[in-house]
């Protein structure tokens, strides 16, 4: 590969990594073309990009990424990068699920907002709630609070009316 082509790949990958909220390194050696296409499709559905490049080029691209120096330690054998732009947890869920069915896909390391996670932390990451799940839970909690406010106001008003009625009855007697 010509030097200009390599430099362009490094530049493109570096731009993607700068935008990423989560970067996951995987080993895919032994995955056939059909399984790789299936994996890429799963990533695409979740808004995650899966990129394969030479380790030396990935290492160059990681130089300006927060936590990239430690992530570079995982660049051995074949390396694929799952890049999560909107949801840093989505790649972990897909890698965990897909890896259970296909043992050839192995999680190496990940970085989320500068924090580096080793291979043994994949299950922890995959069980975390995604951004959309967290937003959904928060919206549900807000909805409960908002729907409770009228009930509380009605209860207070009812109690107030009852107290006023009792005071009025006492004054009449």
Curated annotation (Swiss-Prot):
GO terms for molecular function: large ribosomal subunit rRNA binding; structural constituent of ribosome. InterPro entries: Ribosomal_uL10, Ribosomal_uL10-like_sf, Ribosomal_uL10_bac, Ribosomal_uL10_bac_type, Ribosomal_uL10_CS_bac. GO terms for cellular component: large ribosomal subunit. Keywords: Ribonucleoprotein, Ribosomal protein, RNA-binding, rRNA-binding. It holds the Pfam family Ribosomal_L10. Gene3D superfamilies: 3.30.70.1730, 6.10.250.290. Signal peptide: none annotated. GO terms for biological process: translation. Forms part of the ribosomal stalk, playing a central role in the interaction of the ribosome with GTP-bound translation factors. NCBIfam families: PRK00099.1-1. Part of the ribosomal stalk of the 50S ribosomal subunit. The N-terminus interacts with L11 and the large rRNA to form the base of the stalk. The C-terminus forms an elongated spine to which L12 dimers bind in a sequential fashion forming a multimeric L10(L12)X complex. Belongs to the universal ribosomal protein uL10 family. This is Large ribosomal subunit protein uL10. It comes from Chlorobium phaeobacteroides (strain BS1).
